[in-house]
Amino acid sequence: MIEINVYYKKWYSTIKKPKIFVKNVIKSSLINLNIYEYKPIISIVLANNILLQKLNYEYRNKNKPTNVLSFPYDKLNKKCNLGEIFLSLDTLIEESIDLNIPIEHHTCHMLIHGLLHILDYNHEEPLMQYIMESIEIKLLDKLGIRNPYVSRETIYP
């Protein structure tokens, strides 16, 4: 089950039908990762810089906003609560403008990035970063979105 909370109403004027958009990205990713049949519970909060900065400071001791934060809960099994993903629309818009890419594409990328974190992937070491980015590229390609790493440095929270 995918639970989506639109905390920041500006999402509605930026992404067409944001709840459906997010649900489709997560569902596609779970299917392509061959884990949709597990029916995991995933909570997604569509937020802003104010909330993400507060959470980033509280949980990571970084007093600045970020694009995505993930909070993993359970390991993958039937109907487990995988965790929460928080996205900041403000930061995603800024980054999309800087990268000259559609906000929808960057949002897909950061949703997938957050999903992989709650599935226990990380980018702390070069090999893990390579694995995680390779999966992101594959999942984005399934959505018709080009490789985000071709012409830029990696953006991580």
Curated annotation (Swiss-Prot):
Please identify the protein, giving its name as recorded.
Answer: Endoribonuclease YbeY
What's the source species for this entry?
Answer: Ehrlichia ruminantium (strain Gardel)
Give the source's domain of life in one word. Bacteria
Explain how, and how many, cofactor molecules are bound: Binds 1 zinc ion.
| Broad class of enzyme this protein falls into | hydrolase
Q: Which NCBIfam families match?
A: rRNA maturation RNase YbeY
Q: Give binding positions for Zn(2+).
A: 113, 117, 123
Cystine pairs: none
Q: What is its main location?
A: cytoplasm
**One GO process term, biological-process aspect:** rRNA processing
Sorted keywords for this record are: Cytoplasm, Endonuclease, Hydrolase, Metal-binding, Nuclease, Ribosome biogenesis, rRNA processing, Zinc
Question: Gene3D superfamilies given for it?
Answer: Metalloproteases ('zincins'), catalytic domain
- Subcellular locations according to the entry: Cytoplasm
The terms describing its cellular component in GO are: cytoplasm
